[in-house]
Amino acid sequence: MAKVTERYDVTWEEMRDKMRKWREENSRNSEQIMEVGEELINDYASKLGDDIWIIYEQVMIAALDYGRDDLALFCLQELRRQFPGSHRVKRLTGMRFEAMERYDDAIQLYDRILQEDPTNTAARKRKIAIRKAQGKNVEAIRELNEYLEQFVGDQEAWHELAELYINEHDYAKAAFCLEELMMTNPHNHLYCQQYAEVKYTQGGLENLELSRKYFAQALKLNNRNMRALFGLYMSASHIASNPKASAKMKKDNIRYAGWAANQINRAYQFAGRSKKETKSSLKAVEDMLETLQITQS
């Protein structure tokens, strides 16, 4: 196969810059990274200067994703020679163990790293990733809670914990995690939407009211969030049909549901879609409107 430089008429400098761009964007396009990176380290290592080390790491991770253990091991050996004893390189060794499904070896390695450096967040997160890969959600939850006791500001960890609680159907704790996220990210419409979905799933009139409120907030933050729009419709519809709701509450929520249904219809009509599944979705909305005796304007 022709080399990248020949196929695309690019220089090694352009390839190096492309690798840097992928790193900055956190791209996980493993096949491309591996193809470009392997040519760089094979043919231009002497020209790359200190960039060679971060490229070795980048290529190694891509090779693990792609199942190229030979390339991953080559990169790892080069990094070990240059940085003996480095925790970062040890973590890469652990990631290779993970790719080989040698989970116990990886856990032991991460534990040794944490004994030497208890603040090493990367090693902690790798341990959590292993628990999830093994389907040990309860252990992953325990590890994440311990992690968040020390690193309470890690938003990614809070969201990961919320997802794990949702998978375990522990919606009250999932809601708590999402509340933490909304406090620090009040303008993130996706957190509002997910919190609303959790409250909707919990059920009960009070939770449904909260659900409708946060679906509305998600829409306020992003008026193109169709999932939030459908959520607003569903939560308002269920409140309107709840026997514990007052007459005023039912009347208000019939109005909210009607507004949401009209917006859904308009969105589909504006998009000009005619697919069968879209028509079915619209028919379902219309049927629910009829059930609730909502008159569309």
Curated annotation (Swiss-Prot):
Localization in the cell: Endoplasmic reticulum membrane
Record-linked Pfam families: TPR_EMC2 (PF22890)
Keyword Iron recorded: no
KW Endoplasmic reticulum (keyword) present: yes
TPR repeats: 87-120, 155-188, 192-225
Alphabetic keyword roster: Acetylation, Endoplasmic reticulum, Membrane, Repeat, TPR repeat, Ubl conjugation
Main location: endoplasmic reticulum
Membrane-topology descriptor: Peripheral membrane protein
GO cellular component term, pick one: endoplasmic reticulum
Record InterPro entries: EMC2-like, TPR-like_helical_dom_sf, TPR_EMC2, TPR_rpt
GO molecular function: membrane insertase activity
PTM info: Ubiquitinated when soluble in the cytoplasm, leading to its degradation by the proteasome. Interaction with EMC2 prevents its ubiquitination and degradation.
SMART domains: TPR
One GO BP annotation of this record: tail-anchored membrane protein insertion into ER membrane
Modified residues (N-acetylalanine): A2
Alphabetical list of PROSITE patterns matching this protein: TPR, TPR_REGION
Family, as annotated: Belongs to the EMC2 family.
Subunit structure: Component of the ER membrane protein complex (EMC). Interacts with WNK1 (via amphipathic alpha-helix region); promoting the ER membrane protein complex assembly by preventing EMC2 ubiquitination.
Biological function: Part of the endoplasmic reticulum membrane protein complex (EMC) that enables the energy-independent insertion into endoplasmic reticulum membranes of newly synthesized membrane proteins. Preferentially accommodates proteins with transmembrane domains that are weakly hydrophobic or contain destabilizing features such as charged and aromatic residues. Involved in the cotranslational insertion of multi-pass membrane proteins in which stop-transfer membrane-anchor sequences become ER membrane spanning helices.
Protein name: ER membrane protein complex subunit 2
